Amino acid sequence: MPFAEEETSLARCYAAAGPARCREALAQVLALPEGTRYLAFSPDVLERIASRYGPVRVGFTGALTEEELARYGRSRAVQGISAGDAHEFLCQLQADEAFSPVRTAAARAAVWDAFLRQDLTLLPATLPDALRASSTALLTDFAAQDYTLLGTVLEFLANNSALPHAEALPGAWDAKAGTYTVTDDSRAAVQTFLSVSPASGNDASLREP
């Protein structure tokens, strides 16, 4: 993202200039709607958050082939997995040079999407508290009241049987450096997901009653 007349990572921008400046940079890079909040965290933090939900059943069809799964003693059948085991498996994939970062990201999306879908009624009670407990490790512009608001929104969604949706954004991955760089394809995917017009930067859905 742009920062101090150069490009840098979200983590470096956050450490140097704080959450508000990072929000400005993200909005500029991804053409986000006005008022958008952001929440980013590492795989380690995600594992700690997901561990509150217990084991879930995950299928990797569409993310990994049968041969790829067999290398790690797994199959394409839906299988039970804990947050810790999922994190370990994903780390193995990331370290395996035979797997592209894009394939690893697809597997990661499949795993954590399953954790969020496991029991919608748990989300309002557990996710905000789990995020608060890991607040020092988050990259976010959430204020204290935003975690409460998140719980309210999640409760509304759970009561109306809304389902979480996870996607792995396209972009430029550098496996050795462990970095991800936003590209034109990344921007287009975000704009499609949020129904954002690149010209206006506004979400049409936000204008609906």
Regions from the language model: what does each represent?
Residues M1-E7, L139-P209:
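C-terminal solvent-exposed extensions
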Residues A16-S75:
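Amphipathic, coiled-coil-like alpha-helical scaffolding segments used for oligomerization/assembly
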